[in-house]
Each structure stands twice: as structure tokens, then as C-alpha cells.
Amino acid sequence: MKELYIKQKLLSLSGRFTVKDADERDVYIVEGSFMKIPKVYTIKDEREAEVARITKRVLTWMPKFTVAVAGEEVITIKKEFSFFKPRYTIDALGLEVTGDWWGMDFEVYQHGEFIGDVKKKWFTWGDSYQVRVNDESQENLIISLVVAMIV
């Protein structure tokens, strides 16, 4: 099982942060568009090749994101109205997310098979997450899903 770590900077206007492996090497670079509508986050690999694009839809009642992996739109994430805990609806072929989304502690399944999980690290400077990927062929998908939920 591969472990990756996401650490968001506390005060970053551009929304740029990295995803590192267990040896603290940059595996992915996430860059947000600054002052652009719609807001777009691009996920690139260590060779600067784009692996996914997250777009925040405009003119929606609640936040809505679409995730394109390898140029194909594969996930739509909609934040639902809720007073206390954030609630999301995820539309993706065969993808299911279970657990505590509010505490960012959840598991990801595809067609009933476990492919990864996410755990938020508390008491850190900025937001930090541990992402474990069970099926490495789905790594880009899992990282894209997590980034869409935390931005």
C-alpha cells in the first residue's frame, strides 16, 4: 500500500501545495488558478505533466466541483446544505466514499473493492492529510478526489 501526504499551506493565495511520498519527495503538484472564474485546480506529476483538473462550477447554490482525470470528466462532487457537518454527494461510476467526511477520515471503494483511505492529521501547521492508496492504478483518481474535497 502506497502512502502519500498532502500539506496545505496556511496562507497561500494561489492555492499551490504538493503531495509527497513517504520519503518526502514531491509526487504531485497542485496549483490553483488565482483570481480566475471558474476556479480551476491542476494536478501535475513530478514531470509537470497534467494528470487531473478540478473545476469549481459557478452559479450554483452550493459548491460543485467536476474532476477530470486524463482529460475525461469522471467525478462530480456537490456540497449539500447542512447546519453542522459538511455533507457531499459524489457522482462517479462505481465510486463510493464511506466514513467521516467532516473529520476527513474516510475510505474509498470502487465497485465494492477497497482502493484507498484518507486521514486528516490534527494539530499541525496548516492542514495535513495521509492518503493510503491500495490500488496504484487508481492513485490519480484518489488524489483528485481528496484535493477536490479539501480545496
Regions found by a protein language model. Give the residues of each.
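Intrinsically disordered, low-complexity proline/glycine-rich segments
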Residues: 1-151
